[in-house]
Regions:
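N-terminal metal-binding scaffold of metallo-dependent hydrolase/deaminase domains
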Residues: 1-39, 50-52, 380-383, 401-402
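C-terminal cap of metal-dependent C-N hydrolases
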Residues: 12-13, 348-350, 354, 367-404
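Metal-associated gating/positioning segment near the N- to mid-region
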Residues: 50-117, 135-142, 210, 234, ...
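Histidine/acidic-residue-rich catalytic or RNA/ligand-binding cores of hydrolases
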Residues: 67-70, 139, 236-242, 274-287, ...
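His/Asp/Glu-enriched, well-ordered alpha-helical/loop segment
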Residues: 221, 286-288, 297-380
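Divalent metal-coordination and catalytic microenvironments
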Residues: 9, 24, 29, 49, ...
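Active-site metal-binding motif and surrounding structural segment of the metallo-beta-lactamase
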Residues: 37-53, 80, 180
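Metal-coordinating catalytic core of metallo-dependent amide/deamination hydrolases
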Residues: 119-288
Length: 404
């Protein structure tokens, strides 16, 4: 692996320090030095006019849902088409500056393996395998006339399994063990209704405390954790009291619930971009889903602010689904409007790295860290709309190798 000197850019380290003009020396896939002069004989990469940040991390993706939604979950397209869309989505995700992702439901470890091997381009992937849901709950996408016994989670072995059903603690325990057998890094449960749900309401709570606790016990036994999809306070509290360590979406979190999350060390990953995408273009779905998205938009922001005030660790995830996931960076733009551009960037880098347990390796531009670096044409801290524009990402390095 050749050494590189990145020259002429403004550097945003995401450590909390102000941006600075400095060169970066990359050796053996890691950051060897920041500042000083270029060593003799090293290859120089001209980064004049760019802003360099740590590689972005999306803590809530669905790489396996990269096709038209209704066709993809209803046998409306071939396995070959689904696979092609997934592979293209992986490459696009990396190209737009996301060097690491946490997949929150749908892919199998086989996809992780082919990306890690270099057979297809893509980000570093941490994944939960299939979503865990109850019969008729969020994630059970079967039509109402389809017998529940026929549901297999749209399983494509080695590529994609959307969801597994459990209706008692023993079934949850078996499904959790099966997920880990297949290579899951953590577990995700749906504990409330969802925006894109056929059979439930946003106000529904799902899974009993005993069912959630069974999943938590299996994850804890393996040194990992459970995160939950949650759009109402009752579901969030049930999950937190059962021992989960992270909440996705977090719609409607109030002060009391935020305090409980902070006390128990539970993190939050809001997903504003997915809500905006459903409201803006519908994703080819029935109009009722856009109406649901409109219901959660402000409540999710309110939950974020309540959690922030309580001192909850807050990551960043896009949750975008469907054929066009190129604008997942819009999550940073939306967060910048709620907080600040720097806070949004730090959430998408340093905070997310900690949430994934990778903060010793990635998340900041520091000596010794892996050289995952993104170059923006312009300064997204001054113009946060650049985060949402994939064309503004003009340089991507992963492990010290230029990939875009």
């Amino acid at each position: 692996m050749k050494s590189l000197w990145l020259h002429g850019a403004a550097i945003v380290t995401a450590t909390g320090s102000d941006p600075e003009q400095a060169g970066i020396l990359l050796e053996a896939g890691r950051i060897a030095r920041i500042g000083g002069a270029a060593p003799r004989g090293v290859e120089v990469v001209d980064c004049a006019g760019l802003t360099l940040t740590p590689g972005l991390i999306d803590a809530h993706v669905h790489l396996g849902m990269a096709s038209p939604i209704l066709d993809s979950v209803g046998y409306g397209m071939s396995v070959a088409e689904i696979a092609a869309d997934m592979f293209a989505n992986c490459a696009r995700t990396l190209r737009t500056g996301f060097t690491t992702v946490r997949d929150c439901g749908g892919i199998d470890a086989g996809l992780v393996g082919v990306v890690a091997s270099g057979k297809i381009a893509g980000p570093r992937i941490v994944q939960c395998g299939p979503i865990h849901c109850q019969t008729g709950g969020h994630g059970h996408y079967a039509s109402e006339w389809e017998p529940a016994g026929l549901w297999s989670g749209q399983e494509i072995p080695g590529l994609r399994t959307l969801a597994m059903l459990a209706d008692n603690p023993d079934e949850m325990r078996r499904n959790a063990r099966e997920s880990f057998r297949r290579g899951a890094d953590f577990l995700k449960l749906c504990v409330t209704g969802g925006v894109i749900s056929k059979h439930d309401k946003l106000t529904d709570t799902q899974f009993t405390s005993e069912e959630i606790a069974a999943a938590v016990a299996e994850a804890t036994a393996r040194g990992t954790y459970v995160t939950v999809h949650a759009h109402n306070v009752a579901g969030i509290r049930n999950a937190v009291l059962a021992g989960v360590r992270c909440v996705e979406h977090g719609t409607g979190i109030d002060e009391e619930t935020a305090a409980l999350m902070a006390e128990r060390g539970v993190s939050l990953v809001p997903t504003l971009a997915a809500v905006e995408a459903v409201i803006r273009n519908g994703l080819g779905l029935p109009s009722e889903f856009a109406e649901r998205a409109a219901q959660v938009r402000q409540a999710m922001v309110d939950g974020l602010l309540a959690a922030k005030a309580a001192g909850v660790r807050i990551g960043l995830g896009s949750d975008v689904i469907g054929p066009d996931q190129s604008r997942r960076g819009e999550e940073l733009t939306l967060r910048a409007a709620v907080e600040s551009p720097m806070e949004a960037l730090i959430a998408a880098t340093r905070v997310n790295a900690g949430l994934l347990g990778l903060d010793s390796e990635i998340g900041t531009l520091e000596v010794g860290k892996r050289a995952d670096i993104v170059g923006f044409a312009g300064n997204p801290l001054e113009d946060p709309k650049l985060f949402a524009d994939p064309e503004s990402v003009v340089l991507v390095l992963r492990n010290g190798v230029i990939v875009s």
